[in-house]
């Protein structure tokens, strides 16, 4: 007599538990991060956060803020025109840069308006993880327990 045991593959187990990149646990975590990250992002009018919400696809394990100014805010450094050594200039239409200019990073830190988000600053992903990592891990644990 012969006995055969067929075990699922690691990938099948991961998918069954919702832990694959498009699984429900990952989607829950992405949604949770998106909700929580707001307080660490620069927030004056809310435009950057609203764009982030609109551009982030919850089924993907990433938060997206794809705007021309996002990297400046995210990294928290002043970028300048290599020719003028200025970040930009004011016009009647608002703040502008030379057309086609590729800016270079400086060592100067940006100054964030913290009137609405006191925790706003650079690398909001790291700030969120440092401040709320254990709480987010507990959220995932609760979610996984309730989905059994």
Positions of predicted regions on the chain:
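Short, Lys/Arg-rich flexible segments
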Residues: 1-70, 76-148
């Amino acid at each position: 007599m012969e006995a055969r045991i067929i075990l699922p593959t690691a990938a099948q187990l991961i998918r069954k538990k919702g832990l694959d990149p498009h699984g429900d646990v990952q989607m829950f975590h992405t949604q949770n991060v998106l909700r929580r990250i707001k307080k660490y992002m620069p927030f004056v009018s809310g435009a950057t956060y609203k764009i982030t919400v609109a551009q982030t696809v919850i089924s993907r394990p990433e938060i997206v803020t794809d705007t021309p100014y996002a990297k400046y805010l995210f990294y928290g450094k002043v970028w300048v025109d290599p020719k003028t050594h200025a970040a930009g200039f004011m016009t009647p239409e608002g703040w502008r840069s030379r057309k086609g200019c590729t800016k270079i990073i400086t060592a100067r830190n940006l100054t964030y308006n913290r009137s609405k988000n006191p925790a706003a600053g650079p690398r909001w992903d790291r700030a969120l993880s440092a401040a709320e990592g254990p709480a987010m891990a507990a959220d995932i644990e609760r979610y996984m327990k309730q989905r059994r």
